[in-house]
């Protein structure tokens, strides 16, 4: 009899690890966090790691390439985290397409997956410090950029579904849904900002080439995984 862990089960555990860690429903079952990652558990402490304390720009401020540069760099950083997990999953599946025979290796993958939100946060902090931007400036630019790019909640839900299927491989029957909550509030704000006329034509033109890039490489940021200390995802067949 084969002994191991079905890939379907392991992938379900990976999803649980990704979305459950910040809410502390999953992580305590495993070893202590790596020392270099542990400081990124709480948003207040994460914000304190950003050197610049510049305030949110005024209502008259407009997006420029310089303003969106941190968001684009953070999207690349978060995408690199996802790609590493995808690579690890592919390596585990390579020997046998239906069974992970090394349960220990599978559990190591789950442990890695639970670190994704913290690694994304670390990447954002590094980008902001490299570019001398504050968290308040990042929040402003992100909200305005998403509004100007015409990205809606529906777009993000579709992109998230595509990301999970591409990354996790054999979850094609699974549906990934993020409850309304803070994510819904954020997209109601961006929709309202877009509809209000506060975004000018130059900003729409600026973001047009980056819309698909954000949907392809910045899904975790579009879901706000770096910006909240609790995050829920519902996985259903």
Can you name each region flagged by the protein language model?
Residues 1-4:
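Positively charged n-region of N-terminal signal peptides that target proteins for export
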Residues 7-25:
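Hydrophobic membrane-insertion alpha-helices, especially the h-region
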Residues 21, 192-237:
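A cross-kingdom marker for long, charged
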Residues 24-90, 94, 226-237:
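Immediate post-signal-peptide N-terminus of mature secreted/exported proteins
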Residues 48-49, 115-121, 182-185:
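Short acidic alpha-helix initiation/capping motifs at coil-to-helix transition points
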Residues 96-158:
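Mid-length scaffold segments of soluble, non-membrane domains
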Residues 131-210:
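A charged, solvent-exposed segment within the mature domains of Sec-exported extracytoplasmic proteins
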């Amino acid at each position: 009899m084969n002994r191991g862990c079905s890939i379907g089960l392991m992938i379900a555990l990976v999803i649980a690890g990704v979305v459950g860690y910040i809410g502390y429903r999953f992580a305590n079952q495993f070893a202590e966090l790596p020392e270099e990652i542990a400081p990124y558990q709480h948003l207040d402490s994460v914000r304190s790691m950003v050197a610049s304390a510049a305030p949110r720009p005024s209502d008259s401020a407009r997006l420029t390439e310089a303003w969106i540069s941190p968001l684009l760099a953070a999207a690349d950083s978060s995408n690199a985290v996802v790609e590493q997990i995808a690579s690890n999953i592919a390596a585990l599946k390579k020997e046998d397409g239906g069974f992970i025979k090394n349960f220990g290796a599978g559990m190591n993958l789950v442990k890695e997956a639970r670190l994704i939100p913290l690694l994304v946060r670390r990447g954002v902090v590094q980008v902001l410090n490299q570019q001398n931007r504050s968290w308040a400036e990042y929040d402003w630019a992100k909200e305005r950029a998403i509004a100007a790019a015409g990205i809606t909640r529906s777009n993000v839900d579709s992109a998230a579904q595509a990301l999970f299927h591409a990354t996790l491989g054999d979850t094609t029957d699974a549906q990934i849904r993020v409850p309304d909550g803070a994510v819904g509030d954020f997209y109601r704000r961006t929709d309202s900002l877009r509809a209000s006329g506060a975004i000018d034509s130059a900003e729409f033109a600026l973001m047009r080439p980056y819309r698909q890039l954000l949907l392809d490489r910045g899904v975790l940021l579009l879901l706000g995984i770096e910006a909240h200390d609790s995050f829920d995802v519902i996985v259903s067949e």
